[in-house]
């Protein structure tokens, strides 16, 4: 009887784990790196990969808390026009179909320097 009970518990747990893992949402910004120094005239290419989970639908790209793009591909890139000199925060947030952030995001900080600073 004890073996049967253990088997039932193990089977129930084994069925539950894939459901939990399927709900995991994540965002990875692969470039530029956090803390990168960028030239002022250069366009910035953001490379990313997203797992939206069950609550997410697509992603929004933000620069300094301002939405600059809607990203519908789970893996890809987006090119930003040149940024003003100074420090900037770039974030990708997973949002629902209603465009509400679900709380999963990744942010990086970059510094844009004048060409004379090189």
Language-model regions: role of each:
Residues 22-39, 117-118:
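Short, compositionally biased P/S/T/A/G/V-rich stretches that sit at domain boundaries
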Residues 38-47:
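Short coil/turn motif common to extracellular beta-sandwich-like domains
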Residues 58-62:
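Beta-strand signatures of extracellular beta-sandwich domains
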Residues 67-74:
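Short beta-strand segments within Ig-like beta-sandwich modules, predominantly Fibronectin type-III
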Residues 69, 95-103:
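Short acidic/polar inter-strand loop motif in beta-rich domains
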Residues 80-85:
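Short, flexible loop/turn segments at beta-strand junctions in immunoglobulin-like
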């Amino acid at each position: 009887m004890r073996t049967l009970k253990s088997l039932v518990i193990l089977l129930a747990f084994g069925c539950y784990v894939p459901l939990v893992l399927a709900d995991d949402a994540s965002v990875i910004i692969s470039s530029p790196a956090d803390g990168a120094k960028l030239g002022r005239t250069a366009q910035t290419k953001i490379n990313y990969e997203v797992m939206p989970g069950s609550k997410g639908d697509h992603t929004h790209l933000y620069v300094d808390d301002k939405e600059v793009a809607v990203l519908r591909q789970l893996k890809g890139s987006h090119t930003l026009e040149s940024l003003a000199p100074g420090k900037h925060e770039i974030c990708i947030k997973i949002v629902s179909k209603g465009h509400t952030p679900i709380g999963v995001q990744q942010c990086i900080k970059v510094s844009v320097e004048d060409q004379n600073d090189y």
